[in-house]
């Protein structure tokens, strides 16, 4: 009898079984005595699948193993698909090796080691390329520029450049000097021209009052309109006139009796003349008439109690009528004339304010028999000096604030003019720009309103300071 070891399929117990000689492995399944069909078991011998018809050998170990319960199948196809994907991928750097290191890090270390090994080779190749480049440059033919003509031209050009710069500086300095001399000549010419070009020589006519013609009087009036009262030409003619008067008064021929002196000092009518004069007004002034036709007359020329002067700067015709007087009176009249010139200049500066003609006649202006003293020569009526305060009164009235309630419409405010409206708007801290109609409408809109009721958009913006 043979003895074999048999491992049970259900309990996995190993037991010794005695079998008859020549028994097969199928006999072990029949001895198990299970209700499970024999087809659901198979036998292995020492880990190898044994055939059911194989004879049992003594001392061997046989195991009865149940078969696995299979499903409907299809799991193999899934394994095949997964295996195909595994075979297709080529990037396994995210995987780890058996030591737990990522393959990416391992590959980097290998590449770095190889690069360090090849560093010496790279340096050698670089040096070799540099030497080859130097050899190629040395092999090329060298060019030496030794043209003497070229060097000569360069030297000549540098010298010519220096000479041209020196000439340019000299020309610029000479042009500046000529410009300064031209300015000096122009200033001298202007200074000489400001003194005025004298026309004909002054002539003293006596007893020829009726010889002046209408043309000469018209030219005189036109020249008076064109002549500025504060021009340098009038001042130079005044100074020459006074010097001539002094010389004539100091001469022995001009001495007269005390009766004539007293009579001459009391004669003459005082007039204040300003405005535009005509030929009729010049006749009246020369003939000493006391009446005025009611129109404004321009204050003409330097006048004194010693005589009257009628001048025309355009044609150079001058008519001078002079009476004998003492030097003391002439000096006093000169002082009064200077004050009257200043008042005239102030009056013209104050927008040409016209002063009405006032005639003051003295009872001793004419003789008892109607004859004029000094051999029929009528003395010119002297002009009364006008004080600065009297002439400044109208200008002060202009700058004084106006009463807006006196104006009924904005059109009436337009008559004040742009400058006056600008001053009034500036006094109220309002916007003062725009046309005449806009300024008048803006000023009329705030008529009679207190400051807190005025539209804020009408106020002018405060001036911004400069940024530092």
Swiss-Prot record:
Residues 240-250 have a biased composition (Basic and acidic residues). Residues 112-143 form a coiled coil. Residues 228-239, 251-266, 303-314, 329-340 have a biased composition (Low complexity). Pfam families: SDE2 (PF22782), SDE2_2C (PF13297), Sde2_N_Ubi_vert (PF22781). A motif (PIP-box) lies at residues 33-46. GO terms for cellular component: cytoplasm; nucleus. Residues 1-71 form a propeptide. The keyword Kinase does not apply. GO terms for molecular function: DNA binding; snoRNA binding. It comes from the Eukaryota. Keywords: Cell cycle, Cell division, Coiled coil, Cytoplasm, DNA replication, DNA-binding, Mitosis, mRNA processing, mRNA splicing, Nucleus, Ribosome biogenesis, RNA-binding. Upon binding to PCNA, the N-terminal UBL (ubiquitin-like) propeptide is cleaved at Gly-71 by an unidentified deubiquitinating enzyme; the resulting mature SDE2 is degraded by the DCX(DTL) complex in a cell cycle- and DNA damage dependent manner. This is Splicing regulator SDE2. It comes from Xenopus tropicalis.
């Amino acid at each position: 009898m043979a003895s074999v070891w048999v491992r049970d399929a259900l309990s996995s117990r190993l037991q010794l079984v005695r079998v008859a000689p020549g028994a097969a492995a199928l006999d072990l399944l029949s001895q198990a005595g299970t209700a499970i069909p024999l087809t659901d078991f198979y036998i292995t011998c020492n880990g190898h699948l044994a055939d059911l018809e194989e004879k049992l050998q003594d001392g061997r170990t046989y195991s009865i193993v149940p078969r696995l319960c299979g499903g409907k199948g299809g799991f193999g196809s899934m394994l095949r698909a997964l295996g195909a994907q595994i075979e297709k991928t080529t990037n396994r750097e995210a995987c780890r090796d058996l030591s737990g290191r990522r393959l990416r890090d391992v590959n980097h270390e290998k590449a770095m080691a190889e690069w360090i090994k090849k560093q010496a080779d790279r340096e050698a190749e670089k040096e070799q390329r540099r030497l080859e480049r130097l050899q190629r440059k040395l092999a090329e033919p060298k060019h030496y520029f030794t043209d003497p003509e070229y060097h000569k031209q360069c030297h000549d050009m540098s010298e010519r450049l220096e000479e041209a710069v020196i000439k340019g500086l000299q020309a610029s300095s000479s042009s500046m000097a000529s410009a300064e001399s031209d300015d000096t000549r122009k200033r001298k010419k202007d200074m000489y021209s400001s003194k005025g070009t004298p026309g004909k020589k002054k002539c003293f006519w006596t007893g020829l009052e009726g010889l002046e013609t209408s043309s000469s009087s018209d030219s005189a009036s036109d020249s008076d309109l064109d002549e500025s009262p504060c021009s340098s030409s009038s001042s130079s003619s005044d100074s020459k006139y006074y010097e001539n008067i002094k010389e004539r008064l100091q001469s022995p021929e001009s001495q007269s009796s005390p009766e004539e002196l007293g009579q001459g000092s009391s004669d003459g009518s005082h007039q204040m003349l300003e405005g535009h004069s005509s030929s009729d007004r010049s006749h009246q002034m020369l003939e000493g008439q006391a009446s005025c036709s009611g129109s404004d007359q321009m204050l003409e020329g330097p006048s004194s109690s010693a005589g009257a002067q009628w001048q025309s700067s355009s044609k150079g015709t001058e008519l001078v009528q002079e009476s004998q007087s003492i030097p003391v009176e002439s000096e006093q009249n000169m002082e009064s004339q200077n004050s009257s010139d200043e008042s005239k200049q102030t009056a013209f500066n104050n927008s040409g304010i016209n002063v009405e003609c006032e005639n003051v006649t003295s009872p001793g202006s004419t003789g008892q028999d109607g004859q004029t003293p000094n051999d029929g020569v009528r003395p010119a009526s002297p002009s009364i000096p006008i004080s600065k305060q009297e002439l400044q009164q109208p200008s002060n009235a202009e700058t004084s604030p106006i009463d807006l309630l006196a104006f009924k419409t904005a059109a009436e405010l337009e008559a004040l003019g742009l400058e006056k409206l600008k001053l009034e708007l500036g006094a109220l801290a309002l916007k003062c720009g725009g046309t005449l109609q806009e300024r008048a409408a803006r000023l009329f809109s705030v008529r009679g309103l207190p400051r807190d009721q005025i539209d804020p958009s009408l106020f002018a913006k405060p001036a911004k300071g400069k940024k530092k």
